[in-house]
Regions:
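Short active-site loop/helix that positions an aromatic residue
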Residues: 88-105
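Polyanionic (Asp/Glu-rich) segments that form extended negatively charged tracts
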Residues: 135-359
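Short alpha-helix boundary/capping and kink motifs at helix termini
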Residues: 1-83, 93, 191, 200-204
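Short, flexible loop/turn elements at secondary-structure junctions
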Residues: 28-31, 37, 45, 49, ...
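Generic detection of long, well-ordered alpha-helical segments
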Residues: 1, 31-42, 86-89, 165, ...
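Short regulatory "switch" loops immediately downstream of catalytic or recognition motifs
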Residues: 46-54, 100-104, 179, 241-243
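Flexible phosphate/Mg2+-sensing switch loops adjacent to catalytic phosphate-binding sites
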Residues: 56-57, 63, 103-136
Length: 359
């Protein structure tokens, strides 16, 4: 039986641990939270920290707010690779950095203590608790180089240029403005908000002993809660397969290129463009396997057969790329690929009452 380390911790307890060294791996989804999610988080945290809009109604000994799980495993480099929870963890880091940027310049005792606590959450520290501001406690490999640089620069310096427009930058600006508004509206409460977030907001870190175990937990949690796309699960399986073959970097680049292509081709009502590609490929595989049943099983159920064996060979991934290229040529009416007769038929099919012909 796989071993799990599960122990709920406050934001401060988790982030300020000496061993805290988080990595968002490159097979994860890009950071996707926008202003809507940040506004919801801010509102929820404010209502928790100041019940009934009253600072004195908060009980620091017993009040807790659950932020959700963080699923990790320790990789070969000793970093805690985040399998689930990267969106909230990244956003919390941006929020704490925005608080630090504002409170770090204040000289009263409470502000100084608050800044010290935030430092220990964002940066690695020496044995005296002093931060090494060149050594962050989180790194990300999932975004483009520019986005990654923006994220790391925000955490290191707390500054932004006008040309920085990533989700990291936009959300950091959002939190900066919310903090300014908060201090102007509730100047007497300024020292309580970040402390209550760090000390009384709770995360559930789940440390698995291996990537396989972490991925199973990741899939289970997201089946029951807010689901990830099926393609995210499939991507993780491909990632493991190609990493074992020493082709990790090649796969990551091909996957990113495939995502860009699918985004331009497919516009499904439900699911993601990559989900749509996997759906169309599923019908190809069903036909190849001689499956004639009119009942179609769920996409993830189809691919997870025999421990995702279909996703553990080079041919499947190459077939997916070829299939995307085919539909790109269909969309662009590639005359080098299709005869006039075929193009006329495809034109007519585009006016079909439903899209079943694409499968």
């Amino acid at each position: 039986m796989s071993k799990l380390n599960i122990d709920q911790k406050s934001v401060r307890a988790l982030f300020s641990e000496k061993k805290a060294d988080f990595l968002i791996p490159d097979y994860q989804r890009p950071y996707a939270w926008g202003e809507k999610e940040c506004q919801t988080l801010w509102d929820d945290l404010f209502l928790f920290a100041f019940p009934d809009n009253d600072c004195d109604k908060f009980n620091s000994d017993s009040d807790e707010y659950f932020l959700g799980p963080i699923v990790t495993f320790k990789n070969d480099a000793g970093k805690m690779e985040i399998i689930d929870g990267q969106q909230r963890l990244t956003t919390l880091m941006l929020l704490l950095r925005a608080f630090y940027e504002k409170y770090g310049s204040m000289k009263n005792d409470k502000a100084v203590k608050t800044s010290k606590f935030i430092e220990q959450c964002i940066w690695k520290t020496d044995e005296f608790g002093d931060p090494d501001k060149s050594a962050l406690k989180i790194d990300s490999e999932v975004a483009t180089d520019k986005e990654k640089d923006e994220f790391l620069n925000i955490l290191k310096t707390g500054t932004l240029s006008d040309c920085e427009k990533s989700s990291y930058a936009n959300n950091y600006r959002f939190f900066q403005q919310k903090i300014v508004d908060f201090l102007n509206t509730y100047p007497d409460w300024f020292s309580f908000f970040p402390i209550r977030i760090m000390n009384n907001c709770i995360l559930l870190p789940i440390e698995a002993e291996s990537q396989d175990t972490a991925l199973r937990i990741f899939s289970t949690l997201n089946d029951r809660g807010k689901p990830l796309s099926d393609a995210d699960i499939f991507k993780a399986q491909f990632y493991k397969y190609y990493s074992a073959k020493g082709k990790r970097e090649v796969f990551i680049q091909k996957w990113k290129d495939l995502e860009v292509l699918c985004d331009s081709i497919f516009h499904p009502i439900t699911g993601t463009p990559m989900d749509e590609l996997f759906t169309r490929y599923m019908y190809y595989e069903r036909a190849k396997q001689g499956i004639k049943s009119s009942t179609t099983e769920a996409l993830r159920k189809f691919y997870e057969r025999n421990a995702y064996s279909l996703l553990k060979n080079d041919q499947t991934f190459e077939n997916l790329i070829n299939l995307a290229d085919f539909w790109n040529d269909v969309q662009n009416q590639n005359v080098e690929r299709f005869s006039d007769r075929i193009l006329r038929r495809l034109f007519v099919l585009n006016y079909a009452p439903n899209g079943m012909w694409t499968y």
